[in-house]
Amino acid sequence: MLIILKENITTLGKLGEVVKVKPGYARNFLFPQKKAMKATKENLIKLEEQRLLLEEENTKKLNAAKVLASSLHDKFIILIKQASEDGKIFGSVTTREIAKTLLQEGYDISHHSLSLGGISIKNLGEYQVNIELHSKVIVPITIYVVRSEKDAHELRQAKLQNQKSEQQEAEQDASKEAADADDS
């Protein structure tokens, strides 16, 4: 099926391009998400008329994604899962579960935007997850899968302590640089 892209999609192409995709992908994902439309003569003419508007809308989405990306910088999520003695969790962690946790923390991100990088999270530990906020904005976040609330609390405290010490080091470095600049 030939479609016209209404926004940049990393795996398909850029805004306004006519691409061929499987009908189910278009019908079940691209059309409902308003990321594409059927490639007809009428739609091609309509697209040319609306190209500036769509590009402006895409720029707004990009800017919003950059703002959200800055708030997600150095973000980590702690998930508590039941696990066996050797660290294998019962079930697995899914993108839906991660999206639900992000929503609870105030970030409305679709599970379609999350990428586990081809791995399945079936053990306790630390994992890197990428969030595609826009085709040009991909933000990595860290997921920690722990066994208990106590482990989660200890991990949270350790992360906060690390962030405080890094911030203090950065402030000290900045003050040293300022002092060195004053001496020059």
UniProtKB/Swiss-Prot annotation:
Origin species: Wolbachia pipientis subsp. Culex pipiens (strain wPip)
Gene this chain is encoded by: rplI
Record keywords: Ribonucleoprotein, Ribosomal protein, RNA-binding, rRNA-binding
Function in brief: Binds to the 23S rRNA.
Recorded GO MF terms: rRNA binding; structural constituent of ribosome
Superkingdom of origin: Bacteria
One Pfam family per UniProt: Ribosomal_L9_N
PROSITE patterns reported in the protein's UniProt record: RIBOSOMAL_L9
Ribosomal protein recorded as keyword: yes
Entries under InterPro entries matching the protein: Ribosomal_bL9, Ribosomal_bL9/RNase_H1_N, Ribosomal_bL9_bac/chp, Ribosomal_bL9_C, Ribosomal_bL9_C_sf, Ribosomal_bL9_N, Ribosomal_bL9_N_sf
Biased amino acid composition, Basic and acidic residues: 173-184
GO biological process, one term: translation
Protein name, entry field: Large ribosomal subunit protein bL9
UniProt KW NAD keyword: no
